[in-house]
Amino acid sequence: MNSSNSNDHENLSAQEFIISDIEEDPDTNYEPPVNDSESENYKDNSDHSNHSSHQNKFYYQNFPENFSKDFSESFNDNQNLKNFNTTDNNFNDDYNNDYDSNNDSNNDSNNDSNNDYDNESNNYFNNDSNNDSNNDSDIEETTKHKLPIERKKRGPPKSIVEGQKKYIEMMERQNRMIKKDKNKSLKQMDAVKLPTSNAKPGPETRRVIIGGKIKYIPIKTTDNQSNTESSQENNVIKKEPNNKLDKQPQKISSNIKDIVPKQETDKKSPVKSIKELSVNEPDDIDSIDQSNKLGKSYNTNNNNSKPIEKQRVPPSLVKKMEVYNSKLAKEMNNINRKKNISGKNVPSKYAKHIEDDVRKQTVRNVKSFSDLRRVKALQDITPDSGVDVNKASIAELKKMRLEQRKREIEEKRRQVENKKPDSAVQAILNNNDLSKFAKMVAIKNLSVNSRHRKMKTGNNVLNKE
């Protein structure tokens, strides 16, 4: 107890010294403690039982509301304990000793807990400050040695990617189909001959429109063309002066044999061997020019006399021609059907309504009475008759109408007779397989059977009655 009281007096003297310093300097503004550890130290000092009233007021004015409430409660508790100790002097010394020991233990535990809390808070703030400093240093180091981060570029959205895949698949399918068609066409087509340097130009073509497209079809060549070409080349020789030809007819004939050797054996071979003639003789030069022209004309005539091969039409064009012809045939069939269609295809229910509507419309459109009579007469007359109905008079139209009615009545009678079944006697007579005797027997049997049927029917009636 003595030790505890001495400690309390020391604490009070220290606090009084602090407060007296503050009161002596009124100009100074006291600031409350910032850290939690300092505030808790003030709380521990305030919990002591021997504080003065002016000290409590000072702390109450400068600390927050919650702290003041706690402080007042603790102060009141301490005062109650003092009163209790002063008034109750009759308690035993053992009880007082126990109470003091309890107080000492409580104070020790409070001091230990406060010290632990202060140590923990200080460690926590120190650790935070150290961590912050370490993090700052790490950030500076990373900024110095910072490398460019390769971020993944955002691709297009999934819908566009799927559309691209579908488009690529469609294009691949198309390319496959095109390759298949090309391979088929190449197999069907014959090997095309490559053009040579000596190849002649192709035959003339004719412009034709097939299925809305322009096509060029080759024209068949005839022997007339070859004759015209040869005649044109022969006319070139005639334009030259006739004097030179008259002077040297023998030389030309002799030179031709030398210039065109072996034409009968090798007609396709061009002129290769030509005898060298002296340059000094001018007549020989003229003969060479003329002989060359004759040789060329001879070769052209031989080449044109060959049979011309027919060029094949490509299969794609043939297919288009077939399709076009089939379309034309269908259109012609449809036109012919429309012409041949009669009113019989219309059902009888609707045919009468249609006829009535047509008659009403014609009667309404008629202006004069004579036209109306003509229209009514024409309605019952069929146009099958050979007479022009529009030019005929009304009297003629009436006659035609009567004749038509007679024909219709006769046709109806015939139809009724044809529909009736033949009698049994007529069927027997018309049967050529039977003899006359067999026919007579069959007819008698029919009459006998008919009598029996009548008798049976009569007996049945009597029995019922």
Swiss-Prot record:
Q: Where is the composition biased (Polar residues)?
A: 73-82, 288-306
In this chain, composition skew of type Low complexity spans 83-134, 221-235
Record's keyword terms, sorted:
Coiled coil
Region annotated Disordered, chain positions: 1-55, 70-164, 221-313
Coiled coil (UniProt feature):
390-423
Top-rank taxon? Viruses
Composition bias, Basic and acidic residues: 40-50, 141-150, 236-249, 259-275
Listed name of the protein? Uncharacterized protein R558
Instruction: State the organism named in the record.
Output: Acanthamoeba polyphaga mimivirus (APMV)
Which lineage ranks, top first, belong to the organism behind this chain?
Viruses, Varidnaviria, Bamfordvirae, Nucleocytoviricota, Megaviricetes
